[in-house]
Amino acid sequence: MQHLLSFVFLNLAGLCFSAAPPPTSAPIFSKPFVVIWNAPIYRCNQLQVPLDLDVFHAITTPQRVPNQVLTLMYYNRLGIFPYTDLYNFTQYNGGIPQKGNLNASLQKAQKEFDYYIPSSVPGLAVLDWEEWFPLFDRNADLREIYKALSINYTLQENPFLSSKEATLRAREDFEKAARRFMEETLKLGLSQRPNFLWGFYLFPDCYNYDFLNPNYTGKCPKSANVLNDKLQWLWERSTAFFPSAYMPVSVSKTQKAALFVRHKVLEAMRVAHLSQRPYSAPIYLYLQLLLRDQNGLYKDEVDLIRSIGESAALGAAGCVLWGSSYYFNDKESCKSLSAYLSNTLNKYVVNVTTAAELCSDLLCQGKGRCVRKNYDSDDYLHLNITNFKIQKIDGMFKVFGKPSITDLRAWAYTFTCQCYEDSKCRAQFGNI
């Protein structure tokens, strides 16, 4: 991608803001906001359906492919975590964290990390563990089995405990063991590949799924905030956060979509600031191209703005566009994807990533990331189509134009800067 941009000398007196958010870690990809592809495309390649993926910072797959910029470690590539099948109740590796073999798990994880992440270049390591949650009370519905098994195990070991005492002991033992598995696995990864950013997929979650509420605000329930506060140890160990905001069709094209994504990102930012580090860990939001549980129904530009655009405006470091091989497994679905990339997605990705980079360079002196002053506004980092043109030339998207003084004023009034670690920046325009 080529940016043919020229800039003007601008001195906007008075547009200097002091109320900036705490600093964040410097971007490992040298861009304030990136969009990463994380979906298998081998079937489309086999079917000789061309896919234009050049606009993405990295093209990765969730499959068993080593040496990727983003490595997604599913449960079967993540040591030997104990778990129980939620449908037939078969117990594996002990079934519950208390009965697991942590040393054996770490030995296997070390080999897997060595294989999948052989390089020392910077990247993202996403640990995808969804069988149980580390907080006892978060294991609801089908995951209630972990509570029952834990209580039974406690009573086997301590038969004279009352039911209440056994439940309290089971909660304590479960959470202690779950923490050890997750925390020690993170520590191992960080020690082996310190240039990678490590974190668990889905964490933190906002639990803002009450879409049927006519007064839906998107805000996390207070109970979610309280429980997330109990995972302080996880926020301290994580060097990146990977929350998920897969958009259901019921909120598509509505303001609820923006509110849903907004508070997912804001909760991740909140817990990031709980860490004792002098700067917050970056946030990479997991999204899907398709609306959740819909095969072939893609997000339109409005939904892209309220997902990718929302996360960029709030100060996320990037988005990961995840997809399953099930989505793109025949010629028709591959052609549909190809058309969607060419006609809708790619131009928007170029727009928002270019705008984020321009705002960072011009408002934050390239030393910080532009973030909304008012998180609950609908201000976005977009190029003004009056002054910019995005064209595809020789198969590559190119951006032509320059921001007007009006454009820059608009950014300055609606955005401030989150400086990178060990950098000094101020939300102001000076000599450009």
Where are each of the predicted segments found?
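Substrate-binding cleft of secreted/luminal carbohydrate-active enzymes
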Residues: 23-48, 68-76, 238-239, 245-248, ...
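N-terminal carbohydrate-binding/catalytic regions of secreted carbohydrate-active enzymes
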Residues: 43-115
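Aromatic-lined carbohydrate-recognition surfaces of secreted/lumenal glycan-active proteins
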Residues: 36, 166-227, 261, 276-292
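Glycoside hydrolase catalytic-domain groove-lining segments
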Residues: 230, 236-237, 243-293
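Aromatic- and acid-rich polysaccharide-binding/catalytic face
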Residues: 68-87, 91, 131-133, 137-169, ...
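Conserved N-terminal segment of EGF-like repeats
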Residues: 298-302, 327-432
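N-terminal signal peptide
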Residues: 2-31
